[in-house]
Amino acid sequence: MPWIQLKLNTTGANAEELSDALMEAGAVSITFQDTHDTPVFEPLPGETRLWGDTDVIGLFDAETDMKDVVAILEQHPLLGAGFAHKIEQLEDKDWEREWMDNFHPMRFGERLWICPSWRDIPDENAVNVMLDPGLAFGTGTHPTTSLCLQWLDGLDLNGKTVIDFGCGSGILAIAALKLGAAKAIGVDIDPQAIQASRDNAERNGVSDRLELYLPKDQPDAMKADVVVANILAGPLRELAPLISVLPVEGGLLGLSGILASQAESVCDAYAELFTLDPVVEKEEWCRITGRKK
């Protein structure tokens, strides 16, 4: 069915209150959108982190009388009469199908392909990871995931143990297993990520070699030959004492989810225990790798 969208601009501080106002006026869903394409860094647990200049978008049933909606919103103290807004009709689409149609197989490095589970494999002789991301982060399309996949593809993982810290969809752990790792361990704070990783591991026939944990359940003595963490700069800095003990002596570390402008501060958090390689950048993001001293 078609929908009507009402968009208004506000500050991040007022976005939640105006979201409530739109819902009270009859919106069936609310979306927050950055007005200026500004990066948003990691929120605190339970916090919705918003941009300084935020578009609040309400979605309404096509039969809604938007004059009535606007009249209700004009009564809100943050808006008032004649408040700036934009109303447009959205065409009827199968949004999930459109997303699926735009997700294609992607190659990383020399051997590795990430393939949507609903697509044909482009190269039967390659290392193919069949992926359905579900609600978890990690499809290979983001520069940070791409940087990590390229790094893993260039390693000799045969017989190695790999930890994927912040595993999301499981893409990095599963890729490592398909590239020859004997065992992988995925850790994530989100139960949906654990389930997505489990489903994708089964789809790729590697579930017997993948262990998955919420942080509260992970083994105390967890160690690996290779540790990869594609999260964000803040957690990477804060969790450096925890992440640094995961690689064995001489083990490898790969970090991403880091803006290039944040690389120096993340490197500083790991330089004492690791011999770090030159930072690799892609678009505005980067990857930091090193070897445990």
From Swiss-Prot:
Record flagged with keyword RNA-binding: no
Transferase listed as a keyword: yes
Disulphide bond pairs: none
Binding of S-adenosyl-L-methionine, residues: T145, G166, D188, N230
Class of enzymatic activity (EC top level): transferase
Stretch forming the signal peptide: none
Reaction(s) catalysed by this chain's protein: L-lysyl-[protein] + 3 S-adenosyl-L-methionine = N(6),N(6),N(6)-trimethyl-L-lysyl-[protein] + 3 S-adenosyl-L-homocysteine + 3 H(+)
Chief place where the protein resides: cytoplasm
GO terms under cellular component: cytosol
One annotated GO biological process: methylation
Pfam families: PrmA
Subcellular location: Cytoplasm
EC number per UniProt: 2.1.1.-
Keywords, ordered alphabetically: Cytoplasm, Methyltransferase, S-adenosyl-L-methionine, Transferase
Top-level taxonomic group: Bacteria
GO molecular function: protein-lysine N-methyltransferase activity
Family under the similarity heading: Belongs to the methyltransferase superfamily. PrmA family.
Described purpose of this protein according to its UniProt entry: Methylates ribosomal protein L11.
PANTHER family: ELECTRON TRANSFER FLAVOPROTEIN BETA SUBUNIT LYSINE METHYLTRANSFERASE (PTHR43648:SF1)
Protein name: Ribosomal protein L11 methyltransferase
Organism expressing this protein natively: Salmonella arizonae (strain ATCC BAA-731 / CDC346-86 / RSK2980)
